Amino acid sequence: KVYMIIGGKDLLNGKRFDKGGYILTYDYDKWSFIDPKEAQKKLNLPRNPRDYTSIAVTTDDSNDEIVYASSMGDGVIQYKNGTPVQSYNEKNAFKETAGGYGSGYCYIDGLAFDKNGNLWMTSSEVNHAVLVLDKAGAWHRLDIEQLRGVYTINDILITSTNDKWIYVPRNRS
């Protein structure tokens, strides 16, 4: 399968294209999509998820397809076999929001799995810029002094030796 997400950041890594959080899937025969209204309705969200920035796909022990989509504003939405099953945000996972935007703005990017099946991600404009959802379902927040409050933190890349590299654009503080 091929996956594609809609939204994200502008060419200067600024926030908000303000596009609906669609996930498009091509299964080598046809395209299909998951409408963000489905996530809003099923997960009782205050708005449609929007501005997806990254996507990570895996399977669980039952061989169900699990998709995580991060967004610039709405945290992370988890899908199981194409159905939204969980929204991760400041209330149940991250414990903090991007400064200056009021309640509920979680700028998440750079989803990547490590060798142990833990899901790593970055979070902009917060004190704990690196977040980990471990394979058991527990959240961990890492405090890296140099990343506190940074305006835009992009991808986290995980190497074959399980090292983590974080991409932070220049001149963005």
Regions found by a protein language model. Give the residues of each.
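Carboxylate-rich, polar loop motifs that coordinate divalent cations or form catalytic acidic clusters
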Residues: 1-173
